[in-house]
């Protein structure tokens, strides 16, 4: 038995251990090591035929439980559909109604509607007020159970449970980690273009549960998560020079990151969470510095008569990619995390900016400006394999999902409107708009919460 302990509720705490406990018994996981039949998604760089999957409403013991169960099934359905790897079957086509998940389904009924995988689940309220969630994942062709788990949580976290289950399904059927149990911090924009109010905001990756972290008194840009997901670093234009701040999501407290002369901007955490790398303006130049958050000591990494900005660490923390105009136009460079010689990796026509390293380490995403368009693309760290994923009037600010398979960015269509968030996978397929309350820009995807 696997036990995940801790049920204390923390209002802004994102870590799973303070919200949800789960356990998986041998009975629940029976068959999970069996060979897969047809229910398997092969992820390649080319087109992928989405896997037909049936996701009935989770059953419950009361009308209230049934309502929550329907909501959980809907969130799972939307998550898997938006990934582009799954084709959820309309519930109107179902022949069999699932009423008891402890009884194996009649797989012939699900084969008839061409389902290759089936998800069944149950939501029940416990005597202590907690919500118990259970699910089973079935291979319809073989009749084998592929996965199963049960969780206990406070009722208000039912959406979080749905995201965790979505990740379990995604991983079992693709062989790769999911990305649904994650958050996005972004800049919420409201008001006219002449009097735009910008606030830091936090939401689930699907656009739900939006929370505002700042009030909009000062302009904010480029928020970035810490590896623990408990802190955000960002740039704020207050009185005086723009500064880099550190915001604690749990407590709501913020602090300035170093009291440097001149501007500080483009902050990002190191993978260990103990350092922040940023650009500092000195005279007419901007160079890269790294600050140790414990000792407050600062180390200079670049020293050129140019503008070096937008740094991003490799997942292992050994290298940094950044933007520099030291060769004329802004281009992408890679160097060791302690400084030294930098290698230019972008050589296409146009200017390159906002580089960010994939959590997988295989690609660096960027914004490219040229030919009257702004494009989002990816390139390998050695400079090979450059690929443009999407182009338009103004696309900018890519950020990777925790599994490195999906990018989020913002697009401003012009014409007096405002920007919106979009996702696209690294093959350039499945471009989708992300729902937000208003205009939105500068997204940053968190690591997985669980």
From Swiss-Prot:
UniProt entry tagged with the keyword Cell division: yes
Keywords: Cell cycle, Cell division, Periplasm, Signal
Statement: the UniProt record of this protein carries the keyword Cell cycle: yes
UniProt superkingdom: Bacteria
Gene Ontology BP, a term: cell division
Annotated localization: Periplasm
SUPFAM superfamilies (alphabetical): TolB, N-terminal domain, Tricorn protease N-terminal domain
Signal peptide as annotated in the record: 1-37
Chief location category: periplasm
Cross-referenced Pfam families: PD40, TolB_N
GO cellular component, one term: periplasmic space
Assembly notes: The Tol-Pal system is composed of five core proteins: the inner membrane proteins TolA, TolQ and TolR, the periplasmic protein TolB and the outer membrane protein Pal. They form a network linking the inner and outer membranes and the peptidoglycan layer.
Family: Belongs to the TolB family.
Function: Part of the Tol-Pal system, which plays a role in outer membrane invagination during cell division and is important for maintaining outer membrane integrity.
Designated name of the protein: Tol-Pal system protein TolB
Species per Swiss-Prot/TrEMBL record: Nitrobacter winogradskyi (strain ATCC 25391 / DSM 10237 / CIP 104748 / NCIMB 11846 / Nb-255)
């Amino acid at each position: 038995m696997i036990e995940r302990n801790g049920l204390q509720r923390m209002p802004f705490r994102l870590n799973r251990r303070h919200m949800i406990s789960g356990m998986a018994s041998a009975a629940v996981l029976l068959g999970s090591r069996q060979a897969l039949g047809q229910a398997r998604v092969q992820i390649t760089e080319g087109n992928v035929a989405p896997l037909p999957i049936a996701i009935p409403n989770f059953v419950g013991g009361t009308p209230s439980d049934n309502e929550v169960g329907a909501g959980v099934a809907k969130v799972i359905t939307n998550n898997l559909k938006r990934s582009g790897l799954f084709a959820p079957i309309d519930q109107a086509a179902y022949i069999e109604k699932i009423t008891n998940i402890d009884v194996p389904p009649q797989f012939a009924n699900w084969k008839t509607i061409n389902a290759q995988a089936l998800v069944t689940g149950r939501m029940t309220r416990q005597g202590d007020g907690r919500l118990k969630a259970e699910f089973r994942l079935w291979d319809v062709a073989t009749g084998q159970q592929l996965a199963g788990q049960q969780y206990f949580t406070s009722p208000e976290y039912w959406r979080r449970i749905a995201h965790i289950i979505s990740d379990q399904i995604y991983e079992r059927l693709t062989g790769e980690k999911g990305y649904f149990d994650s958050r996005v911090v972004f800049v919420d924009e409201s008001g006219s273009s002449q009097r735009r109010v910008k606030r830091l905001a936090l939401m689930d990756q699907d656009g739900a549960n939006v929370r505002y972290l700042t009030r909009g008194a000062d302009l904010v840009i480029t928020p970035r998560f810490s590896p623990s997901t408990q802190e955000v670093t960002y740039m704020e234009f207050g009185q005086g020079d723009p500064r880099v701040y550190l915001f604690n999501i749990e407590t709501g407290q913020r602090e300035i990151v170093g009291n440097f002369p001149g501007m500080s901007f483009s902050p990002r955490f190191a993978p260990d969470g103990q350092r922040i790398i940023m650009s500092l303006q000195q005279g007419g130049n901007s160079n890269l510095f790294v600050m140790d958050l414990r000792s407050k000591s600062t180390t200079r990494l670049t020293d050129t008569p140019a503008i070096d900005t937008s740094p991003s660490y490799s997942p292992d923390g050994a290298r940094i990619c950044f933007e520099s105009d030291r060769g004329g136009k802004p281009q992408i460079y890679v160097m060791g995390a302690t400084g030294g010689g930098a290698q230019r990796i972008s050589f296409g026509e146009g200017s390159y900016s906002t580089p960010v390293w994939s959590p997988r380490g295989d690609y660096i995403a960027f914004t490219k400006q040229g030919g009257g368009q702004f494009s989002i693309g990816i390139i390998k760290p050695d400079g090979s394999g450059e690929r443009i994923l999407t182009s338009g009037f103004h696309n900018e600010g890519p950020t990777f999902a925790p599994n490195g398979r999906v990018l989020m960015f913002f697009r401003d269509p012009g014409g007096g409107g405002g920007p919106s968030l979009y996702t696209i996978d690294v093959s350039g397929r499945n471009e989708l708009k992300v729902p937000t309350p208003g205009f939105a820009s500068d997204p940053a995807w968190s690591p997985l919460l669980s």
